[in-house]
Amino acid sequence: MTQQITLIKDKILSDNYFTLHNITYDLTRKDGEVIRHKREVYDRGNGATILLYNAKKKTVVLIRQFRVATWVNGNESGQLIETCAGLLDNDEPEVCIRKEAIEETGYEVGEVRKLFELYMSPGGVTELIHFFIAEYSDSQRANAGGGVEDEDIEVLELPFSQALEMIKTGEIRDGKTVLLLNYLQTSHLMD
């Protein structure tokens, strides 16, 4: 038996940059008992992320940028090393990630491979992230990257082994990045 969910109330608490909802709903459990819940849900739209790798050079391209939420949560500099990513903004995931790759890393990638879609924080955030990988070469470098407008992004081309070590040392603490680096390692694409 599937659980039945009845929306009681959806109150918007904030609609500034993204939308924060206060949701009241009844959940009918498998045993038939109905339980009322109130939760705040943050709707930031869906996104996509990509790990660029070069199997010949044994390198990956990551970015470093300021992330205010990490700063609020104790990351003193607020800087985070991560894979290129962005919100879909009504684009298809592959279209989005190609745009983000060129804006943030400067690489105009060829074939991209979609791996999976994951919720990263389903207890309170609606975002579904589409995960991609793509090989890159030096000849695909179209510009310096660094993002657009108010973004201040540093492009990092790192040895793959160093990126894996940076997970162990805590220098890489972004979930999507750890997932993609571990995928690349277990897929043996860099062997």
From Swiss-Prot:
GO terms for biological process: nucleoside phosphate metabolic process; ribose phosphate metabolic process. Disulfide bonds: none annotated. Coiled coil: none annotated. Mg(2+) 1 binds at residues 85, 104. PROSITE patterns: NUDIX (PS51462). It catalyses: GDP-alpha-D-mannose + H2O = alpha-D-mannose 1-phosphate + GMP + 2 H(+). A motif (Nudix box) lies at residues 86-106. Its cofactor is Mg(2+). Mg(2+) 2 binds at residues 100, 104, 151. One of its GO terms (molecular function) is metal ion binding. Its EC number is 3.6.1.-. One of its GO terms (cellular component) is cytosol. The keyword Manganese does not apply. Keywords: Hydrolase, Magnesium, Metal-binding. GDP-alpha-D-mannose binds at residues 17, 38-40, 67, 85-87, 104, 127, 150-151, 176. Nucleoside diphosphate sugar hydrolase that hydrolyzes GDP-mannose as its preferred substrate, yielding GMP and mannose-1-phosphate. NCBIfam families: nudix-type nucleoside diphosphatase, YffH/AdpP family (TIGR00052), PRK15009.1 (NF011585). Belongs to the Nudix hydrolase family. NudK subfamily. This is GDP-mannose pyrophosphatase. It comes from Escherichia coli (strain SMS-3-5 / SECEC).
